[in-house]
Design a protein with these regions (language model features):
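Short, cationic motifs built from Arg/Lys/His that form the positively charged side of catalytic pockets
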Residues: 52, 82, 152-156, 233, ...
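Second-shell residues forming the walls of enzyme active-site clefts
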Residues: 59, 63-215, 221-222
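Hydrophobic face of alpha-helices
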Residues: 18, 65, 210, 228-231
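A substrate-binding/cap region within the structured catalytic cores of diverse enzymes
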Residues: 1-73
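Secretory-pathway/luminal and periplasmic proteins that interact with or process carbohydrate-rich
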Residues: 45, 91-92, 239-241
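Mid-to-C-terminal alpha-helical segments outside catalytic/metal-binding sites
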Residues: 215, 219-241
């Protein structure tokens, strides 16, 4: 687990582990890994992240997540940092229920700095979590323009402006979303809020989602220039042949 790696290995050893893993993934035709977790562990109150977090210390979490991302990158695999703006101290498991974070000021003190540090050292895509931040109302971060604006602006400690790819967590199989929204509605809401890639785990709703996005671009609810910018960012991840 990431926790075990952080307590038993040096960062350069973790880079080697990730490089070996990435090599095996690439041999199987996989070019992206939705890892590493940048969440800062909040203790037993949040079992959703647990030992997927490298550490409860923001600096340690950032160091080891960056080392892991570097190893994947060296193997030709695109890493993805998650779960912005920080799941480690949130209440509840987004697979099962709504999950609420501490106040934004607390996120900026503890949970957000690792994202800034990691992105400055090994730039990579970022996955948003289905996290409700008190100051942003009741809409989860994956569907909330405020979350995308914060990530893009870099307006948090250690942060800087970000123009990379942003992907959502799963929009179809996690109750924090599926209890409230259909998959096509969630996908369109995420894209118009600022996501570049709307992720879900089945193809069942794909035709309807495509139709809804097409209609939204046509009628202006999803501005064409915004759609084209996201498309350009997403397709920039296509691997070298």
């Amino acid at each position: 687990s990431p926790r075990e790696m952080a307590t038993t290995m040096k960062p350069e050893q973790v880079t080697g582990v990730a490089r070996d893993l990435g090599t095996k993934l690439r041999e199987r035709g996989i070019t992206m890994d939705f890892a590493p977790v940048l969440d800062v562990d909040g203790g037993s109150a949040n079992g959703a992240i647990g030992d997927r977090s490298f550490s409860g210390d923001p600096a340690v979490a950032a160091t080891y997540a960056t080392a892991f991302a570097q190893g994947l990158r060296e193997a030709g695999i695109e890493p993805v940092y998650k779960h912005f703006p920080g799941h480690g101290r949130a209440s509840g498991d987004t697979h099962k229920q709504t999950s609420r974070t501490p106040a934004l000021a607390s996120l900026k003190e503890v949970d957000l700095p690792p994202f800034g540090k990691a992105l400055s050292q090994v730039p990579a895509p970022v996955m948003l979590g289905h996290l409700v931040v008190p100051e942003w109302g009741d809409l989860p971060a994956t569907l909330n323009p405020a979350a995308y604006n914060l990530l893009r602006s870099g307006d948090y400690p250690e942060g800087s402006p970000y123009d990379g790819v942003i992907v959502t967590d799963d929009l179809s199989g996690m109750k924090a979303i599926s209890d409230r929204f259909s998959t096509p509605t969630a996908a369109l809401t995420a894209l118009t809020a600022g996501a570049d890639i709307a992720l879900w785990i089945t193809t069942d709703d794909l035709p309807k989602a495509i139709d809804e996005v097409d209609a939204a671009v046509t009628d202006g609810r999803y501005p064409r220039e915004k759609f084209e910018a996201s498309f350009a960012r997403a397709t920039s991840l296509q691997p070298d042949k």
